[in-house]
Amino acid sequence: MNVITMLEREQMRGDIPDFRPGDTVRVHIRIIEGQKQRIQAFEGIVIRKKGGLSQASFTVRKISYGIGVEKTFPIHSPSIDRIDVVTRGRVRRARLYYLRGLQGKKARIKELRKV
């Protein structure tokens, strides 16, 4: 194993839950404004998960006041306080870009049921 890979493994976080595209997640982000620090939640559907060791990222999409908002987060970012999986979705694609063109009830994702 080379030196760069070893350094990347040290920087990685171990408290990340297992989630996939189609899942609804709540990402708690640590925001620093001047001397103050607060935590803001961003809840939406995971439309993409990009691999890699320390460069892994995921994109979350939500509808805010009728406008679609997408944010891409690095998985191992120190500014992410925690990630909560709200619901598991059942999809057959790895990239859910088709949700961008859908509105209302057509943009719903089936919930994965445990049997």
Swiss-Prot record:
GO BP: any one term: translation
GO cellular component annotations of the record: cytosolic large ribosomal subunit
Pfam families: Ribosomal_L19 (PF01245)
Record flagged with keyword Nucleotide-binding: no
GO MF term list: structural constituent of ribosome
Keywords: Ribonucleoprotein, Ribosomal protein
TM regions (residue ranges): none
Highest taxon, organism lineage: Bacteria
PROSITE patterns linked to this entry: RIBOSOMAL_L19
SUPFAM superfamilies: Translation proteins SH3-like domain
Entry keyword Ribosomal protein: yes
Family the entry assigns: Belongs to the bacterial ribosomal protein bL19 family.
NCBIfam families: rplS_bact
UniProt function note: This protein is located at the 30S-50S ribosomal subunit interface and may play a role in the structure and function of the aminoacyl-tRNA binding site.
Record protein name field: Large ribosomal subunit protein bL19
Organism of origin: Syntrophus aciditrophicus (strain SB)
Encoding gene (name): rplS
